[in-house]
């Protein structure tokens, strides 16, 4: 166990270390102990269960830090990589957007398009960034206009820690230093959208874009075409851009979607109504005059 600091790490002594057994159906603690003065620990499992994996966790400054899963069946000794814990701070350090990937699908039968975004959020400081309340997230970013049906996806940041408010996606999960944390979410673009814009509201080191409509036109600063990529028997035009600055725009000119006869219904009704009105006026003009009564 190690305690992370601004420039180095030190042993985390006397920390309570818990080993958990995890399967697809359930998870729970198996055993625990305290780390020694050098931050080391040794937990003996007499009958390791090979039906799942084991993870080691440690609590520090109100947060749990968890190791990578290890398989315990059939091996007398398993090494677990060091877990590095950090002190927590509110409103700092800043969280950087290291990479953004957006995948834009073809229109559905309803004319809407599904977009999946994967972001990599990076904490370059020496403490774990946490939130004070539900009003001040640990990170926030703009989402495109003419979109809806937002939902969080799988990644390092749980969907339960993601909120969508007005024109923004908000993250309330703690973000620790080290490797960038992956955030994913999806949404639908309104039917009939011809120009789809990804707004850039903060410095973005790199952006990758996949567009299933390979005839779409993409405009962005420092844009490079990466050819066509095949993913699960679907073909996408690939692009990269960056670095990007606040105020930059990624514009995608989309081709017209599928023809939907129901989209013409309002116009058909209007034409029929106009035709009926003309017929009524014509009929009134053609109606013979009333016969006069003779005295």
Report the location of each language-model feature.
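Lumenal/extracellular ectodomains and adaptor appendage modules
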Residues: 2-294
């Amino acid at each position: 166990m190690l305690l992370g600091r601004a420039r180095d790490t030190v042993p985390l002594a006397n920390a309570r270390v818990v080993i958990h057994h995890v399967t697809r159906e359930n998870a729970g603690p198996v055993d625990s102990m305290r780390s020694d003065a050098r931050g080391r620990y040794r937990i003996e499992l007499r009958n390791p269960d090979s039906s799942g994996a084991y993870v080691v966790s440690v609590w520090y400054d109100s947060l749990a830090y968890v190791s990578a899963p290890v398989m315990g069946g059939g091996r007398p000794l398993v090494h677990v990589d060091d877990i590095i814990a950090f002190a927590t701070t509110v409103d700092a350090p800043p969280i950087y957007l290291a990479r953004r990937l957006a995948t834009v699908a073809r229109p559905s039968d309803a004319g809407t398009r599904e977009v999946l975004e994967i972001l990599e959020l990076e904490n370059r400081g020496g403490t774990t960034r946490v939130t004070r309340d539900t009003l001040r997230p640990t990170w926030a970013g703009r989402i495109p206009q003419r979109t809806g049906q937002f939902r969080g996806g799988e990644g390092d940041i749980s969907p339960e820690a993601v909120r969508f408010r007005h024109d923004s996606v908000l993250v309330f999960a703690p973000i620790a230093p080290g490797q960038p944390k992956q955030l994913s979410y999806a949404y639908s673009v309104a039917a009939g959208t011809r120009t789809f814009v990804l707004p850039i509201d903060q410095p973005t080191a790199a952006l990758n874009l996949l567009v299933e409509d390979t005839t779409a036109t993409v405009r962005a600063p420092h844009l490079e075409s990466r050819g066509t990529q095949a993913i699960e028997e679907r073909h996408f035009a690939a692009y990269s851009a960056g670095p990007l600055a606040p105020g930059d725009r990624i514009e995608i000119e989309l081709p017209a979607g599928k023809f939907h006869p129901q989209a013409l219904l309002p116009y058909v009704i209007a034409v029929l109504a106009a035709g009926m009105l003309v017929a009524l006026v014509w009929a009134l003009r053609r109606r013979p005059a009333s016969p006069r009564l003779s005295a």
